[in-house]
Amino acid sequence: MVVGKKKKEKIMENIKKAGSEEYETSWGDDGVPVSKKKSKVKQGKHSRAAGGRFELKVRKDLEAKGRIVDKWTNNVDLEECKVIMAKRKYNPFKKMLVVGTGFPDFISLKYIQKDSYSVIGVEVKMNGILSKIEKEKCVWYLKNKIFSDIWIAKKGEKRGSIEYMDF
């Protein structure tokens, strides 16, 4: 079997990463080893934890403002144009299913008057920037009148403050 020069270099680079103390090797979904820098893995853990704390803070803030808040566990299938149940993510190392994969993160209800409620979707983003797919989902939710508004919660200018932006 003849191996090309570029393929050989890539194989040697992967071998070097696997033996290095700087990299952590894990197995991907297709059974192929994936090398990640340990510093990036640590940074990802910190970012994910900070995002979870910020989500909890936003939820408490909305509840303090008199809104009923619940985790939204649905998502939009843009190809079929319908609301579907969000897929659970399985973590084989912790032997558990992660539920929080819906878009937006929360559904918020507030009584307005007899037989009238404000139904708002709340997406929590530390920087307040939505991806292209998330923007398309927001447009779909509003067009189909699933939510009356969609708020994007982001960190405010002052330490500890939260800003809500209308989509």
Question: Regions from the language model: what does each represent?
Answer:
Residues 2-167:
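Catalytic phosphate/metal-binding cores of nucleic-acid and nucleotide-processing enzymes, i.e., regions
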